[in-house]
């Protein structure tokens, strides 16, 4: 029998990721080289690849991508068609949604929300306290 997990939207077939032990829906794609922490969740059709990290209570869902050496941590939420790539970090209670992109060495943290078609790149830091 396939394990199921409730990601907050009902139970779906899921499994624990071998690198970190976090929950990954069977519909999501996560590389073995990525780290999914024990309380982190990846579901929907999300993609986490390369050496990306999803830690703490962070969530990556829908069609979102996290790649490269990017990190999503705290209670951060990455969803929609959002992309977090390269060495970018999303942390705290921040969210990156819709078609937003965070890449380069950019940081999005605290309670910041990046959405729509926004781009955060280079060494930019977006926070809201």
Feature-to-residue mapping (PLM):
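Thr-biased low-complexity repeat/linker tracts and other Thr-enriched repetitive architectures
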Residues: 44-123
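Intrinsically disordered, low-complexity terminal regions
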Residues: 4, 122-129
């Amino acid at each position: 029998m396939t394990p199921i997990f409730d990601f907050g939207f009902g139970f779906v077939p899921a499994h624990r990721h071998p690198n970190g032990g976090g929950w990954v829906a069977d519909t999501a794609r996560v590389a073995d080289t990525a780290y999914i922490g024990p309380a982190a969740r990846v579901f929907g059709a999300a993609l986490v690849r390369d050496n990306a990290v999803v830690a703490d209570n962070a969530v990556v869902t829908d069609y979102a991508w996290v790649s490269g050496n990017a990190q999503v941590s705290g209670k951060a939420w990455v969803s929609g068609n959002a992309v977090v790539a390269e060495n970018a970090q999303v942390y705290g209670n921040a969210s990156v949604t819709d078609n937003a992109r965070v890449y380069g060495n950019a940081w999005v943290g605290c309670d910041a929300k990046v959405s729509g078609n926004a781009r955060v790149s280079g060494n930019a830091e977006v926070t809201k306290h």
